[in-house]
């Protein structure tokens, strides 16, 4: 059994990166491997935007990530710098920066690149999407 960490750099919609990462995560968990964390970076931080509202007949990727994190105790880390540049923030950052409100999906956590570095050091495999 291997431990994996995923790096997601694609948005929830518009490319296949995030949906491929989710399918890969589900497959490796089904095979008995351990998914320690998912780090959302660059456009990937948009996977943590709770204001994303897909059409009724579309797959809700943001909520699917949230469910995966809750069900399998997977850390869903979001790069704080990349998130703030793209309008994704939690209540603490919103208050510090005098922003109108927070929109980070529950289950996701703003974190720094140190979290990614730690994952690279502690996981058997790091896969980028």
UniProtKB/Swiss-Prot annotation:
GO terms for molecular function: sulfur carrier activity; sulfurtransferase activity. Part of a sulfur-relay system required for 2-thiolation of 5-methylaminomethyl-2-thiouridine (mnm(5)s(2)U) at tRNA wobble positions. Accepts sulfur from TusA and transfers it in turn to TusE. Heterohexamer, formed by a dimer of trimers. The hexameric TusBCD complex contains 2 copies each of TusB, TusC and TusD. The TusBCD complex interacts with TusE. Belongs to the DsrE/TusD family. Keywords: Cytoplasm, Transferase, tRNA processing. The active site is at 79 (cysteine persulfide intermediate). It is found in: Cytoplasm. The keyword Cytoplasm applies. Gene3D superfamilies: DsrEFH-like. Its EC number is 2.8.1.-. The gene is tusD. One of its GO terms (biological process) is tRNA wobble position uridine thiolation. This is Sulfurtransferase TusD. It is an enzyme of class 2 (transferase). One of its GO terms (cellular component) is sulfurtransferase complex.
């Amino acid at each position: 059994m291997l431990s994996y960490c995923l790096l997601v750099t694609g948005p929830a919609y518009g490319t296949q990166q995030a949906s491929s990462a989710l399918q890969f995560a589900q497959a490796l968990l089904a095979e008995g491997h351990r998914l320690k964390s998912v780090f959302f970076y660059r456009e990937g931080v948009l996977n943590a935007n709770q204001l994303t509202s897909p059409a009724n007949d579309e797959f809700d990727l943001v909520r699917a990530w949230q469910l995966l994190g809750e069900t399998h105790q997977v850390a869903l880390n979001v790069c704080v710098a990349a998130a703030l540049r793209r309008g994704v923030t939690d209540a603490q950052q919103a208050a510090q920066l005098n922003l109108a409100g927070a929109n980070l999906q529950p289950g996701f956590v703003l974190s720094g690149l140190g979290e990614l570095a730690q994952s690279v050091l502690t996981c058997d495999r790091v896969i980028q999407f």
